[in-house]
Structures are given as structure tokens and as C-alpha cells.
Curated annotation (Swiss-Prot):
Alphabetically ordered keywords of this record: Amidation, Ion channel impairing toxin, Neurotoxin, Secreted, Signal, Toxin, Voltage-gated sodium channel impairing toxin
Localization: Secreted
Family of this protein: Belongs to the formicidae venom clade 1 family.
Signal in keyword set: yes
Function: Vertebrate-selective toxin that causes pain by targeting voltage-gated sodium channels.
Main location: secreted
Species per Swiss-Prot/TrEMBL record: Pogonomyrmex rugosus (Desert harvester ant)
Molecular function GO labels: sodium channel regulator activity; toxin activity
Tissue note: Expressed by the venom gland.
The protein, known as: Myrmicitoxin(1)-Pr2a
Residue numbers bearing the Asparagine amide modification: 88
Signal peptide from the UniProt entry: 1-23
């Protein structure tokens, strides 16, 4: 059973946005309308969108690297969840 390429890319995008919001919660452009005017947050969002578009445009032989990237980008979110729920109570 093959896992769709789009699923890996979605995990990477969620991991990127999660690690950004965990590191700097006030720079979350989805929660704070004033943050949309922040050029740094806008540049990060554009770079993420561009990286996803490039990954979707690549041919399928690039697929073996996507599971590793998805795993690596999910680690900050997992670490944040563990710290929040287990360590800090």
C-alpha cells in the first residue's frame, strides 16, 4: 500500500507551522490579524507555500525522502506536546 505524496507534504507543512507557532506563539498569523502585516511571518508563509509547490511539482522518484522529512518536521510538535502534557502537567 502506497501512501500518497500529498499526505507527506501535508505533514511537513503542519510540522513547519506547528514548530513556528510553538517557538513564537505571538507570530502565529492565523490567530492574530495584526501578525499578517508582519513581514517576517509573511515571508515564512510564502517560503513554506513555495516549498510545498516545488515538492508537488517534483516527479515521484523523490518520494523516498518525504517520509523522513515528514518525521523530522513532526518532532518539534511531538516534543511540545510531551512537554505540555507530561512534563509540565
Amino acid at each position: 500500500m502506497e501512501i500518497p505524496k500529498l499526505l507527506y507534504i501535508a505533514v511537513i507543512a503542519i510540522g513547519l507551522s506547528g514548530s513556528l507557532t510553538c517557538a513564537t506563539p505571538l507570530a502565529n498569523p492565523w490567530a492574530d490579524p495584526e501578525a499578517e502585516a508582519n513581514p517576517e511571518a509573511k515571508a515564512i508563509a510564502e517560503a513554506t507555500a513555495e516549498a510545498i509547490a516545488e515538492a508537488l511539482a517534483e516527479p515521484e522518484p523523490a518520494l523516498p525522502a518525504l517520509p523522513l522529512l515528514a518525521f523530522l518536521f513532526s518532532l518539534p510538535a511531538v516534543q511540545h506536546w510531551i512537554e505540555k502534557n507530561w512534563i509540565n502537567g
